[in-house]
Amino acid sequence: METYYKAINWNEIEDAIDKSTWEKLTEQFWLDTRIPLSNDLDDWRKLSAEEKDLVGKVFGGLTLLDTMQSQTGVEAIRADVRTPHEEAVLNNIQFMESVHAKSYSSIFSTLNTKSEIEKIFEWTNSNEYLQTKAKIINDIYENGTPLQKKVASTYLETFLFYSGFFTPLYYLGNNKLANVAEIIKLIIRDESVHGTYIGYKFQLGFNELPEKEQESFREWMYDLLYQLYENEELYTKSLYDGVGWTEEVMTFLRYNANKALMNLGQDPLFPDSANDVNPIVMNGISTGTSNHDFFSQVGNGYLLGTVEAMQDDDYNYGL
């Protein structure tokens, strides 16, 4: 009989990067429910009203980007997979983007009141700079070429998130909100793999283009980055001018914009390097976690769940 549908065979790998990425992502699987966020409540109460407002807004913005990535971003690049294993990796990425988006709600429910949470989401869903970057990226997801979609995804994963990531990393470096920052470090660890992987898949397609097409496409890539950077500068000023961190955040953004370009196999655009970034924040960006140990309750990484033997009554569902 003619083959109607093919089973995926993980014993026949066409691209070793698919397998190594799958293994990396599954190895670092995590859930927000395993982080003891309530341990940060003492730190939270000591923050000023302005600082609390900043934290709420940056996490609102990050929630929006992760929501878009989980709903339309991964779907947009799924149609152009080269191997069935690539599609499996994208399934994993899509699920983890949903975990990331949910994690911010876990932070909100721990630190904020119901009315504060409502205000955060109201701000997020109406902020002009957030909505502008969402529109720029999502328009490409809906109307761009397969290569353009991969560029948009890599810019989002490796560049646009970082105006928000700066805040928790800064507090972590100052011994505040350590468990909130632990979630952010876990998210950064995921996004680092996502951006590298999708950038690699982009390079495979880009390198197949004739030289002239590469030149015009490269122009489009840098134009898009400039457009996003200009909007991100306005967004950053609106968030950080009040606490005086704007210039440091912009340096951090330029550094990560260069990383996004390098993931895509392109030359960096900005002069900023890791040495220019606030060392406290740079230290926090390392993709290890403070205590990624399922068998320990020491530190601020994963906590061991409480296990008890099953009883007969446990099987009386709804009785």
Question: Which ranges hold each PLM region?
Answer:
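Non-heme di-metal
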Residues: M1-L319
